[in-house]
Design a protein with these regions (language model features):
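Auxiliary alpha/beta "docking" domains used to position bulky ligands
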Residues: 1-148
Length: 148
């Protein structure tokens, strides 16, 4: 199943795919807790909310067994010129990357259900997030072998 998911992710257009065991990020939770208690988050009070969900995907989506992480490069050759404020490259597109990635994830999910059946993929699989859940995304990318 792992190889199928990774291969289908690439065929769907993602640049990479990794899979990590869903479990509490205990070291990250301890660090984040002390970081928050020290006030390092300044005015970003939203970081205080959903603490357990941020550090444990099973709390966010019960019965989760794995976290599938996909990467999509949004680099563009387009250079900004002149004395103007810089805009992040992900914002150069006329299409919102959230919409693009969500659509690609739906195709990937459909391929998995088609191959393995809906009874193998429980309803918790259908939870796809694109910057829309309180997850430590970089840590999950690292755990899935896609980051450092």
């Amino acid at each position: 199943m792992t190889n199928f998911i990774k291969q289908k992710a690439l065929e769907t257009g993602f640049d990479a795919c990794g899979i990590a065991k869903a479990e509490a990020l205990e070291d990250d939770a301890a660090f984040m807790k002390s970081w928050l208690e020290a006030g390092m988050h300044a005015d970003m009070h939203y970081l205080e909310r959903n603490f357990e969900k941020r550090t444990n995907p099973v709390v966010l989506v019960p019965e989760t067994k794995s976290v599938v992480v996909v990467l999509l490069n949004y680099y563009t050759e387009k250079e900004q010129t002149g004395d103007v404020p810089r805009i992040a490259r992900y914002a150069h597109s006329k299409i919102d990357y959230h919409t693009v990635i969500k659509s690609m994830l739906a195709k990937l999910e459909s391929a998995i259900v088609e191959k393995f059946g809906s009874d193998i993929i429980n309803s918790s699989f259908q939870h796809s997030f694109v910057d829309s859940a309180p997850l430590l995304e970089r840590r999950w990318a690292q755990r899935a072998g896609l980051g450092w």
